[in-house]
Amino acid sequence: ATYGDPGLKKCNESDVPRPISAYGGSKLMMEMLCKDYMTAYGLSSVGLRYFNAAGADPEAEIGELREKETHIVPLAINAARQGKTFKIFVDKYPTEDGTCVRDYVHVMDLADAHIKALNYASENLTSEVFNLGSGAPASNKELLETVQKYTGKMNIEIWGNRPGDPAYLV
């Protein structure tokens, strides 16, 4: 969110942030406030820039409950299981298959990263940000092909590009 639309290149922590949404702007503002607090008061912090969180607790002990699901992985799986049509935004993105490319990172890896970030901040006088991704990007089309591999054929409805959706966010 803080990088905005980086074009077709991998995001690096040293890239200049250019948020294109209020959400991205608010994340960047918090990073800047944390850096100011470190300078003024010696309070260390670590900002974690996730890409796309996905997955669930393998023990099924904890989870999340949303009134309206917005994430592609559970939406696609639910559509396949219920025989509903899945809407995909495609064909105009400048990527190999015309769909958005994202880096999905498992929620358990994110939980582990949070613990490591807390330890790092408690052991160092610092205010840093780190990208958190899997390093294995997938396009929306590839993601849907994987869902279909395990659930069977899906009904897919193709829509045009979604405004403000970067083509490549890795």
Residue ranges and their predicted role:
Residues T2-N52, E59-H71:
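Catalytic helix-loop patch of NAD(P)-dependent Rossmann-fold dehydrogenases
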Residues Y3-G4, K9, D57, G83, ...:
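A short secondary-structure junction motif
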Residues Y3, A54, A136-A138:
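Feature marks short, surface-exposed loop/turn motifs that line or immediately flank catalytic pockets
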Residues N78-V170:
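C-terminal substrate-binding subdomain of Rossmann-fold SDR/epimerase-dehydratase oxidoreductases
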Residues K68-R81:
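C-terminal helical subdomain
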Residues G47, V73, A111-H114:
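Alpha-helical structural signal
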Residues A1, V46, K84-I88:
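Short coil-to-beta-strand
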Residues A53-A54, Y93:
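Hydrophobic pocket-lining residues within nucleotide cofactor-binding pockets
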